């Protein structure tokens, strides 16, 4: 998940540097969504994974 977030962030930065506003905005939005989903899944696995024997 974080890898995809980083990839979208890099695409957004390159597109912003080249002046493609629409593409940069789309890639930045996708990066934010992937990042938030990754954090949520991490927190769920962190709390659900702690089961006492």
From Swiss-Prot:
Organism domain of life: Bacteria
A Pfam entry, by short name: DUF1328
Signal peptide feature range: none
Subcellular location: Cell membrane
Cellular component, GO, one term: plasma membrane
Protein family per UniProt: Belongs to the UPF0391 family.
Family annotation (HAMAP family): UPF0391
Protein name according to UniProt: UPF0391 membrane protein CKO_03415
Membrane topology designation: Multi-pass membrane protein
């Amino acid at each position: 998940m974080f890898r995809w977030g980083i990839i979208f962030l890099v695409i957004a930065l390159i597109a912003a540097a080249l002046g493609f506003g629409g593409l940069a905005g789309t890639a930045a939005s996708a990066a934010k969504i992937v990042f938030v989903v990754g954090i949520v899944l991490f927190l769920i696995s962190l709390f659900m994974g702690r089961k006492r024997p």
